[in-house]
Swiss-Prot record:
It catalyses: ATP + H2O + 4 H(+)(in) = ADP + phosphate + 5 H(+)(out). CDD domains: ATP-synt_F1_beta_C (cd18110), ATP-synt_F1_beta_N (cd18115), F1-ATPase_beta_CD (cd01133). It is an enzyme of class 7 (translocase). The gene is atpB. Transmembrane segments: none annotated. GO terms for molecular function: ATP binding; ATP hydrolysis activity; proton-transporting ATP synthase activity, rotational mechanism. Belongs to the ATPase alpha/beta chains family. This is ATP synthase subunit beta, chloroplastic. The lineage of its organism: Eukaryota, Viridiplantae, Streptophyta, Embryophyta, Tracheophyta. The modification Phosphoserine is found at residue 13. Produces ATP from ADP in the presence of a proton gradient across the membrane. The catalytic sites are hosted primarily by the beta subunits. Keywords: ATP synthesis, ATP-binding, CF(1), Chloroplast, Hydrogen ion transport, Ion transport, Membrane, Nucleotide-binding, Phosphoprotein, Plastid, Thylakoid, Translocase, Transport. The keyword Kinase does not apply. It comes from the Eukaryota. It is found in: Plastid, Chloroplast thylakoid membrane.
Length: 498
């Protein structure tokens, strides 16, 4: 961390640095730069190329040193387009790795990989910057306690709980509610934990990035009138950008999150959408640098690159970074090296189901496919574990019986199976929940449900306490008391209709 007096005026910085090189070769986004003997920059140092192209347009390209080639030459990868660059142009060694602005002033803003705001809201009101390349926290600094990160979302907290400072994989296709779930998590961490969030858009569509920004403004996650009240900082390196930018944008987002954890001592949520694109960009850069490809054409350093990012996402004694990473699985092949390497780092998986979304059950989290390493009696306690297992068993039995019901009907089932089906349908509906960020769509006020309330509700349903209540009473409510109140209202309405 350092206070950077030159962030507002890069020209001052360039005049101060006397370490000048010249472009010797350009191959797409890769530059070879020659420096005077004894003046070689370090690996990961930022290099800046300034000048004018043949049309007189100003050029300002930042690169990152990747290899020292010998003969006083380095090979660097550009973070933006290299059109207009020529051999012989001056290159300035900045003497440090890429540094990005950090702190409260980043909230409510959109940045690119270099930490430059791209939202037309003027410069960022901070002089504190931090380099994007750092070591992971030392083991002695880590908080090794296994504690649950309560989200206030029933289906997540009960069946696939998140670990504080853990990593969660989010699997889901288009239109099943991934964005709404992400926004609700951002909202809940701000309200319940006083925490903030950082969103890293890695190699995804520009349109999706813009849609997310607009939805965040609509739902109040970003407050345009008073940016200081915003709960999230956005960092985008979209799929039209060079591989260097897509490879480093995850580190830019992580660096901003680390400041909130280490200096502000907060709980932080870090979203990475999509972690596969980080690997894909690394693969492109590796090929451009001439490295021998590994399995399925991926970079030989795949595990190292993934590990250096994931090991920085952790809980320390000061605060925590809990990361939720969208995982694209190429051709649905879970053995592909990219997702397989990612799975090794995940503590929990949240799988969104199109079938549940089609039924109108939101959040459409699949209760049987979602998993968590935290769901063990010694971590969550016997009561939580037993309740979760009974819920899963009931839903699994219902799933097995669905074919029989479709062919023969409910009447052909045994008394015990009919009771199981009735309870499973209530559980399925009780796993739905009105979200704060979806109030404008549903017309229902959002609900945050504590873990103890969640467990109590499901225990009562499993015990048969509410067998007489209609299943509709359990749909889109918060805790179990709201379900009983809704049942009373439904009964009164039906009497009035008669």
């Amino acid at each position: 961390m350092r206070i950077n007096p030159t962030t507002s005026d890069p020209e001052v910085s360039i005049r101060e640095k006397k370490n000048l090189g010249r472009i010797a070769q350009i191959i797409g986004p890769v530059l070879d730069v020659a420096f005077p003997p004894g003046k070689m920059p370090n690996i990961y140092n930022a290099l800046v190329v300034k000048g004018r192209d043949t049309l007189g347009q100003e050029i300002n390209v930042t690169c990152e040193v990747q290899q020292l080639l010998g003969n006083n030459r380095v090979r660097a990868v550009a973070m933006s387009a290299t059109e207009g660059l020529k051999r012989g142009m001056d290159v300035v060694d900045m003497g440090n790795p890429l540094s990005v602005p950090v702190g409260g002033a980043t909230l409510g803003r959109i940045f690119n990989v270099l930490g430059e705001p791209v939202d037309n809201l003027g410069p960022v009101d901070t002089r504190t910057t931090s380099p994007i390349h750092k070591s992971a926290p030392a083991f002695i600094e880590l908080d090794t306690k296994l504690s649950i990160f309560e989200t206030g979302i029933k289906v997540v907290d009960l069946l696939a709980p998140y670990r504080r400072g853990g990593k969660i994989g989010l699997f889901g296709g288009a239109g099943v509610g991934k964005t709404v779930l992400i926004m609700e998590l951002i909202n809940n961490i701000a309200k319940a934990h006083g925490g903030v969030s950082v969103f890293g858009g890695v190699g995804e569509r520009t349109r999706e990035g813009n849609d997310l920004y607009m939805e965040m403004k609509e739902s109040g996650v970003i407050n345009e009138q008073n940016l200081a009240e915003s709960k999230v900082a956005l960092v985008y390196g979209q799929m039209n950008e060079p591989p260097g930018a897509r490879m480093r944008v995850g580190l830019t987002a992580l660096t901003m999150a680390e400041y909130f954890r280490d200096v502000n001592e907060q709980d932080v949520l870090l979203f990475i959408d999509n972690i596969f694109r980080f690997v894909q960009a690394g693969s492109e850069v590796s090929a451009l640098l001439g490295r021998m490809p590994s399995a399925v054409g991926y970079q030989p350093t795949l595990s190292t690159e993934m590990g250096s990012l994931q090991e920085r996402i952790t809980s320390t004694k000061k605060g925590s970074i809990t990361s939720i990473q969208a995982v694209y699985v190429p051709a649905d092949d879970l053995t592909d090296p990219a997702p397989a390497t990612t799975f090794a780092h995940l503590d929990a998986t949240t799988v969104l189901s199109r079938g549940l979304a089609a039924k109108g059950i939101y959040p459409a989290v699949d209760p049987l496919d979602s998993t968590s390493t935290m769901l063990q009696p010694r971590i969550v306690g016997e009561e939580h574990y037993e309740t979760a297992q009974q819920v899963k068993q009931t839903l699994q039995r219902y799933k097995e019986l669905q074919d029989i019901i479709a062919i023969l009907g409910l009447d052909e089932l045994s008394e015990e199976d009919r009771l199981t089906v009735a309870r499973a349908r209530k559980i399925e509906r009780f796993l739905s929940q009105p979200f704060f960020v979806a109030e404008v769509f549903t017309g229902s006020p959002g609900k945050y449900v504590g873990l103890a309330e969640t467990i109590r509700g499901f225990k009562l349903i499993l015990s048969g306490e509410f067998d007489s209540l209609p299943e509709q009473a359990f749909y889109l409510v918060g805790n179990i008391d709201e379900a009983t109140a809704k049942a009373t209202n439904l009964e009164m309405e039906s009497k009035l209709k008669k």
